[in-house]
Amino acid sequence: MEYLSSNKIAIIDLGASKTIQKELDEDLVKEKIGGAGITTALYEEYRDEDPIVLGTGLLTGTLAPASALGMVTAKSPVTGKICHAPFTLYGGVELKYCGFDYVVIKGSSPKPVYLWIHDGIADVNDGKEIWGKDVWISTDMIREVMGDPLIQILAIGKAGESESDFAQVCINYWASGDRWGFGKLFGQKKLKLVAMRGMSLLEIADPEGFVRKCKEFLSTIKSGPYAGKGGIGELSAAMGEDIRQWLEPIIHRHLSCFNTPFPTNTFVFLDEDPKLLKETEKKEPGFLITDVHGLLGYKKLGLSAAEACDLLRDCAKYGIDAVAVAELSQKAGKKKPDEIKKSLSGLKGSLESVGKGKFSPWAPSFTLSSDEWERRQAVAYLFGIHPIYALMSPEFSEEKLIELANLGTGLGFTSETLDKVIIDILK
């Protein structure tokens, strides 16, 4: 696969501590497009070896607006089905730039390990020094050892190590869109984390046409209803659950994921003045809210914004799904922060918030029907578009994404191709 691709798939056998590489077949891209289409195909190819598949969308890491998506595809311990969880911020683009479009992780290691994927190389390294550490400490340790603070990391905490059904794979220090318990799968495989760093380049079939169309696309988006807005508060308002006034006193700033026009993340200060302009001297001044549902769950328990965000921080360090914690705490009648924190290590119960679909409910439905939401998510996961922003922006038409894909690859994708792939991954 020559264009919009690193042209490599890493097959990592944790049991043997070995990695092999194979080319990304252009025929597979023509048939499955990318993203969840190919991660699903790779999962099926290695199904007998209980794989976890990391992947990127066809447009991930390009000038296409909101092309920030990376994904994890595996069998969910929560639903028992093959599901897809998103990771955004700069994780998706880093995976593609480090030299691999897809990574298949199969088998289990007899001892703790982590993966170091960089510059077209995938190493299986001893993880005994970071096993037992929380997500934040693990992330810091790897970045310090490698001497690079820009390394992107998918990590589990103690919830994953203890194989909790609600263990989450986190992105750097923060919650991801993993609502499927994929952190438990990492723990079962003795895989502590995946560290990614690279500076590859992507070739484009029609560079001038692709860049021109991306600029036109972005210009259209800038005149949309969310232009000039941003943050978790705006997301909640669009969902019909406005928390802006409740959250405002602790907001420090809003942050966008790679090349995403709308900042879907909000950083709050918990141990520092939120209006501080100079660099804080505190080591852990606050928390980046990346999941609106977790925040809303704690608000429904009657907590203050500061209490809710402090709990989100504890959940991220422990590597557990905050939405599950909030829902099960409500069922158990636990509404005090201290008693909720104490329950993290023994959390059990069934969830109603997960749903039965293939794509993470991390992305709000807004005003879409379930069928509309599912199709929009499928399109986002194929092309590598931020799943939340894809729902917020009607400008992301399937026709425009197909046009960008064809300018980028020259492969001649059609709406019929897209329909077929969507049907396949929704089976």
What positions do the PLM features span?
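Extended C-terminal regions of large enzymes
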Residues: 13, 19, 28-31, 68, ...
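Protein-protein interaction/assembly regions in multi-subunit complexes
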Residues: 1-179, 183, 188, 192-201, ...
